[in-house]
């Protein structure tokens, strides 16, 4: 991953971890992954600060099993969280069990879609606000409190965007007639109009990600934190979510670790 002379073993402080996960966002609909139509300035700039993985794949093209997989490190069938809308078996260990003994405060703010609580005993869970928005006040308070107490943290920020119904953001930013649609879509006016609303919600999600990064900056925790961006499975248009076509399991994955990960690097490693 392009590590510098400052290795993990040489660090005297435990790094913080912040993982931002989108919801139903095809990786190729981000600017840094090749989209010519999307507006994702925060994610694109973030990619210049870390390593962008080109071959990051999920275990399954569904939300709940993917999140169980992410938080437990287990294949969903093994944890019990398969198919969608199921939960892990009692007794399954999650990232919370592994990090809390090391002194970490572990929190999830945003979408959950995981269960039971005994498997995911987060120190803090804050659901989305009414309308599905992230609670940025809770994000800032959690980071600020950990900083004040000198406690390392692992924070999962789970956005609801750009999951349908695609009713957030400003679709007027996008000209339906000039969009470059993926070749597998049926190119009709209705598809183009729908796609503008999807892109608008991606832009909305990008702003959410930018807000989270700004909070890290405000709390002066950027240089002490590993930040990961994931796009989750593809959108709900054909040949993506729910399928094992590439768009269904291929995720955007970008990692920033100041002083450790080489800025602007690209990795073809399979992750």
Where are these regions (language model features)?
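Formylglycine-dependent sulfatase
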Residues: 1-271
């Amino acid at each position: 991953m392009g590590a510098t002379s400052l290795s993990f073993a040489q660090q005297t402080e435990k790094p913080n971890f912040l993982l931002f996960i989108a919801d139903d966002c095809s990786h190729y609909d981000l600017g840094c992954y090749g989209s010519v139509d999307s507006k994702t300035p925060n994610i694109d700039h973030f990619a210049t600060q870390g390593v962008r993985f080109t071959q990051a794949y999920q275990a399954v093209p569904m939300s709940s099993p993917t999140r169980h997989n992410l938080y437990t490190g287990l294949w969903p069938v093994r944890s019990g969280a398969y198919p969608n809308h199921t939960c892990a078996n009692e007794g399954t260990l999650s990232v919370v069990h592994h990090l809390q003994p090391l002194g970490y405060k572990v929190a999830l703010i945003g979408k959950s879609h995981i269960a039971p609580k005994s498997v995911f005993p987060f120190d803090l869970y804050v659901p989305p606000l009414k309308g599905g928005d992230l609670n940025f006040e809770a994000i800032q308070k959690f980071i600020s409190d950990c900083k004040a107490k000198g406690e390392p943290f692992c924070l999962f920020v789970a956005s609801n965007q750009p999951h349908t119904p695609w009713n957030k953001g400003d679709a007027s930013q996008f000209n339906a007639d000039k969009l470059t649609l993926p070749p597998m879509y049926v190119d009709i006016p209705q598809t183009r109009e729908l796609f503008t609303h999807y892109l608008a919600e991606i832009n909305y999600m990008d702003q959410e990600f930018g807000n989270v990064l700004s909070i890290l900056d405000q709390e002066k925790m950027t240089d002490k934190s590993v930040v990961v961006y994931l796009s989750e499975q593809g959108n709900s248009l054909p040949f993506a979510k729910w399928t094992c076509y590439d768009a269904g399991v291929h995720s955007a994955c970008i990692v920033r670790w100041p002083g450790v990960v080489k800025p602007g690097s690209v990795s073809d490693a399979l992750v």
